[in-house]
Amino acid sequence: MSPHKIRRDAIKHGYRSGLELKISMALDTIRYKYDYESIKIEWEDLAYRTYTPDFILKNGIIIETKGRFLTMDRRKHLAIKKQHPNLDIRFVFENSRKKLRKGAKSSYAEWCIKYGFRYYDRIIPEDWLKEKGKNKHPKFIRFSTTKIRR
């Protein structure tokens, strides 16, 4: 099936990518409870922004699926990790061996290792699903800072 047909099929089912559809179907098959794009996480760049993670597992783990892992996505996730260190955000890549950009030596996997993110390829590993719960997330997670703005 062509990439355009895969994406069209995913959109028809309410997802943004073929990988998201594939993961949701796998979770549905094993009757695993999850939420799709159900929370928003506020983070600060030059302005306040919100991030909507792809999947929130019943144990509180946040799953972000990525076919392409662009510079702006990497920057965003580093900022979110710094601003919300209590969140357990993990990646499921289409291919974690893919290079960060053309001519780069580092791959998506190496970036995750360097910055302390857990990752896997194409599926959510069973041990992630079986991990004991961390916490439930509110529908909106606000950015909070202790620094005084002037």
Predicted regions: what is each one?
Residues 1-150:
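Nucleic-acid endo/exonuclease domains
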